[in-house]
Amino acid sequence: MLELNFSQQLGDLHLQVATDLPAQGITAIFGLSGAGKTSLINVIGGLTRPQQGRVILNGRVLVDAEKNIYLPPEKRRVGYVFQDARLFPHYRVRGNLQYGMAASMRGQFDAIVGLLGIEPLLNRFPFTLSGGEKQRVAIGRALLTAPELLLMDEPLASLDLPRKRELLPYLERLAQDVNTPILYVSHSMDEILRLADQVVVMDAGKVRAVGGLEEVWASSALRPWLQREEPSSILRVSVIGHHDRYAMTALALGDQRLWVGKLDAAEGNSMRIRINAADVSLALQPPHSSSIRNILPVKVAECLDVGGQVDVKLAIGEQWLWARITPWARDELGLKPGQWVYAQIKSVSFNRQNGPVPD
């Protein structure tokens, strides 16, 4: 558990954070430029000192301003991956990886190298590497220090699109195969959707929302960032099985079934899906004949007027589904909170896929 309760004045920015974060998975720190994202992880990493408050990691006090306790960065057991890789230019990749490597990680060296796909790079110097390769080496070096927490400050920000696409699959593998919790700073929605388990939304130095990705995505906290885009829903599902006759896969969504094009995934695998609100239409009764395969009963939670459209928040089990309709459709259907309707889902896209769902 990472316990944060501190304040810090940085020029015009007043950083004020009071929240607890789980010591597992990837927690995305999200917000616009100047929101305080990097300032937050700099306090955790020991690069800056807050004027008030405490930072506690797994019961160890990293910061207690009132007692003048500021554990130096090298004693915090916190790894840091910067926007630029900051490799030692006079060391080969192997030397960079071994610099600061914890004795307990010597037996893990080959596994980390394999996980990040950098074995062919071990004898090369940093100046011969691409941006994506440098970042993979930087991540490996940080992991080999045996950190209790890994901080990543927009590791894709300095990369062009091809290099981002090159590095993202390795970050996804990292999320699945390494037990080290990660705080991942980003202002990219796409990165967060692919990588994050939890999300912290920051604005003007303060935490505006914190929770699981699906929960925060469905809340109003992200709406200021989503208004320019088509709203969507993020849902957690698992594979039930595959159709005997058609190239279709059945997914469990709560106690309901969702059909999608056939996936190369075993029964029990969990994954995250994204459904655009414009791909969800509503009906008071299920149609008798329709080309749409997914027609699910849902309960209306609220209706929001947004720029001449209506966004309808729908409860589906313990998760939330958004539909975007016209005011005319809302009035004709007589939609109101608590009402049961049928959601017709036309299209589904996929984000990160995980392993079997535990019992």
Curated annotation (Swiss-Prot):
One of its GO terms (molecular function) is ATP binding. The keyword Nucleotide-binding applies. It catalyses: molybdate(out) + ATP + H2O = molybdate(in) + ADP + phosphate + H(+). It comes from the Bacteria. Its EC number is 7.3.2.5. Residues 1-229 form the ABC transporter domain. ATP binds at G31, L32, S33, G34, A35, G36, K37, T38. InterPro entries: AAA+_ATPase, ABC_transporter-like_ATP-bd, ABC_transporter-like_CS, Mo/tungstate-bd_C_term_dom, ModC_ABC_ATP-bd, Molybdenum_import_ModC, Mop_domain, P-loop_NTPase. It is a peripheral membrane protein. GO terms for cellular component: plasma membrane. The keyword Cell wall biogenesis/degradation does not apply. Belongs to the ABC transporter superfamily. Molybdate importer (TC 3.A.1.8) family. Part of the ABC transporter complex ModABC involved in molybdenum import. Responsible for energy coupling to the transport system. This is Molybdenum import ATP-binding protein ModC. It comes from Yersinia pseudotuberculosis serotype I (strain IP32953). The gene is modC.
